[in-house]
Amino acid sequence: EGREILIIGAGRIAARRARVLLPFGGRIRICALQREEELPKEMRRWILERQIRYESRRFSQELISGKEFLVFAATNDPEVNGEIARICQRKGILVNNASDAAQCDFFFPSIICEEEMVIGIAGDASNHKKVKELRKRIQNLPKGERRPK
């Protein structure tokens, strides 16, 4: 809660990362080339509700201040994502490169939130489909079977 999170990119993956992180109280900043009106409706709503900060700008290394707890490289350009990952690793910032699992300090889990519990399911980045299937299987269990006894 309260930690700086930077997401570079504003596509499907970036939106998914932000959607999962929002309930946990991080200070999320999204930077991408798109103008605000070009963003997905969900992102525009988060901006209006001041749940995230948005900067419409091209990536440059000055974007990464060094105060970030997590950075997500989620642009549609693998070279830019690689540059972001290298900068973060030099600065000691945890980074997730959506283009290259080898440049990830962590894998983003699939999350199930139920009442006061959060379940994170992560794989080794080789099979996202398997992780998604397991999450769905758990979510489809009757409520009583999902809770510890």
Q: What residue spans do the PLM features occupy?
A:
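NAD(P)-binding Rossmann-fold cofactor-contacting core
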Residues: 16, 24-46
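Adenosine-phosphate binding glycine-rich loop
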Residues: 108-149
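Hydrophobic beta-strand scaffold residues
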Residues: 28, 54, 92-95
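Residue-level detector of alpha-helix initiation sites
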Residues: 12-13, 79, 125
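Glycine-rich adenosine-cofactor-binding loop
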Residues: 1-19, 149
